[in-house]
Amino acid sequence: MTAIWIAIAALSALALAFGLVLGYASRRFEVENDPIVEEVEAMLPQSQCGQCGYPGCRPYAEAVSLNGESINKCGPGGEAMMLKLAEKLNVDPQPLEGDADIQAPARHVAWIDESNCIGCTKCIQACPVDAIIGSTKAVHTVVSDLCTGCDLCISPCPTDCIELRPIAPTPANWKWDLDTIPVRVIQVERHA
């Protein structure tokens, strides 16, 4: 019985020693990050879709903040994201990458033909935002509110049962152009 207590005490002392060494090492060798990179990364949609040409939002935030990369490459963020980045980084807004005439392309979401889905889960593994639900050997479904339309789930599908479909505009997702709506300003008298 005493051998068990000796083993427990020895392992506890060893764990404490390793904890102290790791704690010291984390403070001693800490790498300081640029706060602007953290702020830009927090502004990005975190879809990790790769449409910007970078493997995720963090590398794109580093490229925009430190290397002067174009701020118009975030597809899921769209024009609103580009304007926020321009304001944050004190640069001029740029037209969205792609066709200059198309300012806001129609939003697309993935759609699964459930009659052909075999439940292989390859699309679930490829989806960077977990917008596809389902389990092995069961039919999968896309949660359209979470889908960013990045099309990363289409190529791994062995039965080609996934396609991107445009979302019809509704009052909830319509891009309101508030600058073209006439506004009448009424002067109000103030009484003391």
From Swiss-Prot:
Domain 4Fe-4S: from-to ranges: 32-91
Keywords: 4Fe-4S, Cell inner membrane, Cell membrane, Electron transport, Iron, Iron-sulfur, Membrane, Metal-binding, Repeat, Translocase, Transport
Cofactor(s) it depends on: [4Fe-4S] cluster
A Gene Ontology molecular function term of the record: metal ion binding
EC number: 7.-.-.-
Assigned GO CC terms: plasma membrane
Summary of subunit composition and partner proteins: The complex is composed of six subunits: RnfA, RnfB, RnfC, RnfD, RnfE and RnfG.
Function in brief: Part of a membrane-bound complex that couples electron transfer with translocation of ions across the membrane.
PANTHER family linked: ION-TRANSLOCATING OXIDOREDUCTASE COMPLEX SUBUNIT B (PTHR42859:SF3), OXIDOREDUCTASE (PTHR42859)
Matching HAMAP family: RsxB_RnfB
Protein name: Ion-translocating oxidoreductase complex subunit B
